[in-house]
Amino acid sequence: MAKCMWLALALSLLSLGWGQDACVMDVNCHLPDCNCASTKSPFSDLPPEFTPQFVVLSFDDAVTVTNYGFYLNLLNTFKNPNGCRASMTFFVSHLYNDYAKMNELHRLGSEIAVHSVTHKPDVEHYWRPANYTVWRDEAVDMKEMLKMYGYIPEEDIKGFRAPFLEVGGNDMYQALYDSGFSYDCSWPALQYTNWYGEEPLGALFPYTLDYLSPQDCTVGKCPDGLFPGMWVAPMLDLLDNRGEACAMLDACQGNNTDCADQTCEDNVFNFLKRNFEYNYKGNRAPFGVFTHHSWFVLDEINESTAHTNGYMRFLQYINSLPEVYIVSMNRVLEWMKNPLPAMDLGSHPAFTCPTFDPETNCLDPITCEYREGLPDPGLKEVLMTMCSRPCPTNFPWLGNIEGK
């Protein structure tokens, strides 16, 4: 009886999400431009080893001298089964961003995406009521500065994440859609995971908004409009050690038998391993570990190595498993558009790598000092390292990206 009730709930959720026109692959939705929301792998009718297990590591906010070494170590430590270096996605905001170091992460194969210019802390009065114009200006101005000061090619800037995951509904998606972004990764999913409920509905794979989304809305305003070809990369909630859901790693807490507040390395490792295996031993939906570098800085504050060592142990563990690829979100989406079995992934254009890294296009970076005209009266000085010359007259900011 309970199973029947849960099935009825699932069907009702789907009907609410898709409305009268259900999305049906190869009938009214065709790759690579359209993909129905689904909890099934493209190879779900074959043994699990046919579906690669993607792990997406993402970091939000500025790339700085403080976190750059940590990121570089990850890139130089881990390689995928095809012999290519692991890649990550950086959702970048402007203040304190070192555009030269960011450029180097891109040169080494990682993805640079947009997180807004201002990243204002006032969710209630700024992000929550933000209209189309606010979202467009925040996204487009940041994209332009990634190009202007970091020499990131426009065609490589595809993704967006809303500050504080405050999804901005149709206004946000329309702004991204009109501005040439191809995906958003701001939208947490709780009900569509491999662990939620007595009989989980399953974890969502990335999908496009050609049809109404069935995804539950836990933060912000989720879209109820159609944006053909626009991808949603669901942020599958993790189950932390308290038994609570969390979309970002630094929001996950809890305890096991010996350690409180996730300060124990074993707790961190076991927490990540447990959540990863929900997908790896389940439907193999892409598994995201989304965080801020500040989570690792807490180790220094607490005179601990728990976060860093637990995280690295987890990456070493998954790096030893077959069919597991640590890749940027844009590569996952390229696979969704043209899925190949894990054993053939080496021939996929998005998963090849050059014998030698490309030469840098950031040949002579410059560091500019700004003490006046800063966006926050509490700021005394801001340094901005960039690939282009000369230094802008004023500190570049929203609405004045050239610093005139």
For each of these PLM feature ranges, what is it?
Residues 3-19:
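Cleavable N-terminal signal peptides of Sec/SRP-targeted secreted and luminal proteins
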Residues 20-113, 118-122, 132, 143-150, ...:
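Active-site beta->alpha N-cap acidic-glycine motif
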Residues 123-138:
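Glycine-rich phosphate-binding "P-loop"
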Residues 127-131, 198-208, 341-343:
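Short low-complexity, flexible loop/linker segments enriched in glycine and/or proline
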Residues 203-279, 288:
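Aromatic-lined glycan-binding groove of carbohydrate-active enzymes
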Residues 204-213, 229, 364-391:
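Low-complexity, serine/threonine/proline-enriched polar segments
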Residues 329-354, 365-368, 372:
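C-terminal regions of proteins
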